[in-house]
């Protein structure tokens, strides 16, 4: 009887772990520049492009804060934003 209760507990524990594990693995790390302070996105957009981040950077601010820190968009994972062209002279044919 004790082994059946233990097996049931172990099964539930394994299922919870299996549900949590993928979210832990898939966390996208956003590199931020240590000690940086910013007030707008334009300041660090060019700096991140210069450092090799093709999508540029942004100013990460927290609630009720006027000064944030500079973070760069990671380039390793492609998203839907990567399909948007910066070229304004794109011809779309039907």
Swiss-Prot record:
Q: Name one GO cellular component term.
A: extracellular region
Q: Does the keyword Disulfide bond apply?
A: yes
Name-wise, this protein is Putative defensin-like protein 88
> Highest taxon of the source?
Eukaryota
Q: Which parts of the chain are coiled coil? A: none
InterPro entries for the chain: DEFL
Q: Where is the signal peptide?
A: 1-26
Gene Ontology biological process terms in this record: defense response to fungus; killing of cells of another organism
For this UniProt record, the keywords arranged alphabetically read as follows: Antimicrobial, Disulfide bond, Fungicide, Plant defense, Secreted, Signal
Q: Give a single Pfam family match.
A: AtDEF-like
Major place of localization?
secreted
Where found, per UniProt?
Answer: Secreted
The yes or no answer to whether the keyword Signal is present is yes
Got any disulfides in this one, which pairs? 32-72, 38-59, 48-71
Q: Which family does it belong to?
A: Belongs to the DEFL family.
Classification from the root reads: Eukaryota, Viridiplantae, Streptophyta, Embryophyta, Tracheophyta
